[in-house]
């Protein structure tokens, strides 16, 4: 099994996207960040990657796989120009132009003295269609953070949201590895944007620079296989996240415990809504979980809950482009737990049969290696190989 790959970030260049073409790097630094992960190399035939197309009711359809210049449908957005200025909250600190700004110790101790999974405002669970455009109550999902680059135009901060992410500790967020499929060596400068609700105003938004990315060692994102497994990336944040009314931490689930089939969980994001409105605000969708057996029947016989869980059987209720890496939250004992990471699904959002999510509960042995003193990790033995 390949060693765990950690990619440290420096510099600022143009944004890539998984639904558009990849622009050439403009990294001003001569020393490229270290990485051992091979970049994605698609075959020469038409093939795609994320959210493979599912024609009709056939249980095991042949996926269509796009070329690298015509990337996957699940779920980042379009490329943007290089940033021209720092976000307001970053201006007070100088950047290290000689290399990445990183904590010295990779296996560092996380301040575990915090509460998780309790929002300052209760979400309205009576509505829920991302594709249908149901807006979330502001501050009701404070663990969700947009992820991408930024620009400043006319003195106004403009976020180029590419994926979603979830804050899980004061120094970490979790997203999908395939969000970096077109930029595996991390040639750009990325941020998570905490407290974001409306992308047209960015009122109260706090950018937090991503200074490290760690892929799951068993992910196949950077291979030719269109059926993603272990679609995880841990994001290390430059600034400590201090919880407040606008941002907070999601709870990690109990190890190897997934809610039963039929449980209603929730996914949130800023993804597109198929021209149904609400593209600029945080939206939410109700997702009913399905069994591993049904997930195998709809997608691939080798799917296992160790890497993937599935859900979302109601027509028209789905995540969509721009929601990749975002959360699947399930509520238990009054708290919200991060059970899944948005990975792939039907190429036409909401058309069925269901979406696939990276399974958090079965990957805590790997995840907890890098935040061992979290309450959720106390009794979990670290396994850096990702074997679960």
UniProtKB/Swiss-Prot annotation:
| Keyword tags | Disulfide bond, Hydrolase, Protease, Secreted, Serine protease, Signal
Name the residue ranges with Pro residues bias. Answer: 54-64
Q: Name one GO cellular component term.
A: extracellular region
PROSITE patterns (alphabetical): TRYPSIN_DOM, TRYPSIN_HIS, TRYPSIN_SER
Enzyme Commission number, as recorded: 3.4.21.99
Name the domain of life this protein comes from: Eukaryota
- State the active site: 178 (charge relay system), 231 (charge relay system), 324 (charge relay system)
The record's note on quaternary structure and interaction partners says: Heterodimer of a heavy chain and either an L1 light chain or an L2 light chain linked by a disulfide bond.
Q: Which PANTHER family match?
A: ACROSIN-RELATED, HYALIN
Listed name of the protein: Spermosin
Source organism (scientific name): Halocynthia roretzi
Species lineage: Eukaryota, Metazoa, Chordata, Tunicata, Ascidiacea
């Amino acid at each position: 099994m390949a060693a765990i790959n950690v990619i440290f970030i420096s510099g600022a260049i143009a944004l890539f996207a998984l639904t558009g073409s990849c622009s050439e790097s403009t990294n001003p630094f001569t020393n490229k960040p270290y990485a051992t992960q091979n970049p994605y190399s698609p075959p020469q035939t038409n093939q795609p990657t994320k959210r493979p197309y599912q024609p009709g009711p056939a249980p095991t359809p042949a996926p269509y796989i796009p070329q690298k210049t015509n990337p996957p449908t699940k779920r980042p957005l379009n490329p943007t120009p290089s940033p021209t200025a720092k976000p307001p909250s970053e201006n007070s600190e100088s950047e290290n132009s000689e290399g990445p700004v990183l904590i010295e110790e990779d296996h560092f101790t996380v301040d575990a003295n915090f509460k998780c999974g309790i929002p300052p405002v209760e979400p309205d669970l009576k509505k829920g269609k991302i594709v249908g455009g149901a807006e979330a109550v502001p501050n009701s999902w404070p663990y969700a953070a947009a992820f991408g680059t930024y620009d400043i135009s006319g003195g106004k901060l403009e976020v180029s949201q590419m994926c979603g992410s979830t804050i899980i500790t004061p120094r970490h967020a979790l997203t999908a590895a395939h969000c970096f499929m077109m930029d595996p060596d991390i040639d750009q400068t990325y941020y998570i944007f905490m407290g974001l609700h409306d992308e047209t105003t960015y009122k109260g938004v706090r950018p937090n620079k991503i200074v490290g990315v760690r892929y799951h060692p068993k992910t196949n994102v950077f291979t030719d296989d269109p059926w993603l497994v272990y679609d995880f990336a841990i994001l290390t944040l430059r600034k400590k996240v201090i919880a407040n009314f606008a941002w907070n931490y999601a709870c990690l689930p109990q190890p190897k415990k997934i809610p039963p089939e039929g449980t209603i969980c929730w996914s949130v994001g800023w993804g597109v809504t198929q021209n149904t409105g609400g593209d600029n605000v945080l939206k939410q969708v109700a997702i009913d979980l399905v069994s591993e057996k049904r997930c195998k029947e709809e997608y691939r016989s080798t799917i296992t809950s160790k890497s993937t869980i599935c859900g979302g059987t109601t027509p028209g209720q789905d995540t969509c482009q721009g929601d990749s890496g975002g959360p699947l939250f399930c509520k238990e004992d009054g708290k919200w737990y991060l059970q899944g990471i948005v990975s792939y699904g039907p190429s036409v959002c909401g058309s069925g049969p269901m979406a696939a999510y990276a399974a958090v509960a079965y990957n805590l042995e790997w995840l907890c290696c890098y935040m061992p003193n979290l309450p959720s990790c106390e009794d979990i033995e670290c396994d850096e190989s990702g074997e679960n």
